Amino acid sequence: MKVCIYGAGAIGGWIGSGLAHAGCSVSVVARGATLDALQLHGLRLRQENQVTSQAVASSDTPADLGVQDLVVLAVKAPSLPDVARQIAPLLGPQTIVLTAMNGVPWWFLQGFGGALAGTRLTSVDPEGTLAEALPVQRIVGGVVHASCSVDEPGQVCHHFGNKLILGEPSGEKTGRVQQLAALLEKSGFEVAVSEQIQKDIWYKLWGNMTVNPISALTGATTDLIMNDELVRGFISRVMLEAKDIGARIGIPIDQQPEDRHQITRKLGAFKTSMLQDVEAGKALELDALVAAVRE
């Protein structure tokens, strides 16, 4: 299977390494120092103090890589407009696009019922360019439950967690999503197929939409955030509002904020992805994590 990783950061590099190890023909869209490192050393993964390298094709021009069977979209939300302008050469009639990103995606309300069914979210796709370039029919949604970081350009580190949740936006258990799940399981990932991937996205967002921005504003790791009673109380109140929003649009969350806090506590002194972006001087995913919920 021909697989292109669009975005060779922590999550994209981790997924791409597993797929390449399983025998897929993996290519990567990258640029700058990351592209240079991939061409020199291959795609490197560090876990359990061992570094492995997988040979991959790489380019900053998608047209160089040709039509793919699967594109794993693992960029940060602010990069999506550029992706929409450049991704077409990777897409054939049957190409699947697996989104492996944080926050609310542009297709979130396109595949299931509820009060806002079919609504375009202007906070994440203001001009409709994402929906045009990547219509919902191409999409398989993904939720990643793993901690990874970038050691250096072209090398990622897997810390813990190995779960990928997949789902059609419509909730159907189609042949293609079952085949994709089997491929990812063969590649060493723990995979579940969801009947409502929007709920899984919303549940992960339930924690990210509060802890990530607070970490970015304060520079605090998750342990410090969870140990501050006033901050934790503020987070809980925001989460209750988000829980109510989810229930109104058809994606209820059964848990209470404190249940989610217990999961966050297990991360220890962890730097959120948004804090890592602040430290690296990168654009922040505020629209996908915060503005979309407000909208």
For each predicted feature, which ranges?
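Rossmann-like NAD(P)(H) cofactor-binding subdomain of soluble oxidoreductases
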Residues: 52-55, 60-151
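Flavin (primarily FAD) cofactor-binding/catalytic cores of flavoenzymes
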Residues: 21, 30, 84-85, 176
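NAD(P)-dependent Rossmann-like dehydrogenase/reductase catalytic/cofactor-binding core
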Residues: 224, 236-295
